[in-house]
Amino acid sequence: MIYKKLKKEFKNTSDLKYKKINKVNLVYLESLCSSNKINDYILKNLTMNKKHIMLRDNISGPSVVYLEDYKSISFYLLNGFALIYDDKDMLVCEVKGDLYRSVNIPTSESSVNGPKDSFNESILMNLGLIKRRVKATNLVNEDFILGKRTKNKVS
């Protein structure tokens, strides 16, 4: 039910990911989160304790926040947190991703004032740059495959 609300709130954006592990649900924005951190802080702990899972005892990370209601979930997701919930508990864990190639100053627009970020070859990094500046649930992206030979992923 929470995931359906989030999917509706984020307007079916393609980087909103959902996984279910042993009655525990995991939701995160792929463009803002590190898959390595998700594996280390969340997935390893959930898959090791298959019989009896208590979220409060099994999730570790640099910043874990226990939530009481639905209101602040989108704020946390847009700031690089993953949502972990089951029937009893709901919490977020910081799994903010690191940028792959450094974001450089654009060479073609050297006289423009303001932030000096530029896009690179990674779709996820570019989405992350946009979503870190524009923290809104109605910012939606959709993935496509273009080209007959190269089949490039565009968003």
Per-segment meaning from a language model:
Residues 1-155:
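Membrane-embedded alpha-helical signal segments
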